Amino acid sequence: TKGTQEIFNRMMNDLAEVSGYSELEHIPVVPVGHSAMATYPWNFAAWNPKRTLAVISLHGDAPRTNLCGYGGENLEWGRTRNIDGIPGLMIEGEYEWWEARVNPALAFRMMYPESCISFLCDTGRGHFDVAGQTADYIALFLRKALEYRLSGHPSLNEPVRLKKLNPKEGWLA
């Protein structure tokens, strides 16, 4: 959408100014979505890959799912926008497990082999609860994303350069 990047940048700049944390102008983002809004983080990453550290879809959907939450077709997906090299984690509870939710993610990985989507079954959990172990796993996922994607020692006053991961080199959470 026209002007969206400028609106996002203004929002982050305003937040940096109001909060006193100037680094908010440039830090990488980890979009998180749950349930029907769990396609949001995939779409954010495709729209702004240089700013996306990692993606978390919690008890939600795959990128470009045919189920609820995806919304209208984003014609730019696959042409000018993708999530190649950005680590993504799709988490489903054991008691909400549904192949119709996983199959679009597997198909996406086949269509976009440079995407780095991993899956986690939240054992013993349903749609609205999360185990402490799952929270620990998400924290580990984010630590590893920082470790492998940050290049050098980023300055607080300039955009962070993120390395693109290659799934052929072993990236799966």
Go through the PLM ranges and name each one:
Residues 18-24, 77-82:
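Surface-exposed acidic, glycine-flexible loop patches that form ligand/cofactor-binding
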Residues 2-6, 35, 99, 129-132:
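Soluble non-cytosolic domains of exported or imported proteins
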Residues 38-49:
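Short glycine-enriched nucleophile-adjacent loop
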Residues 2-23, 31:
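Alpha/beta-hydrolase active-site loop
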Residues 53-139:
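The feature captures the conserved acid-bearing segment of alpha/beta-hydrolase catalytic domains
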Residues 4-11, 37-40, 104-105, 134, ...:
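Stable alpha-helical elements in mature extracytoplasmic
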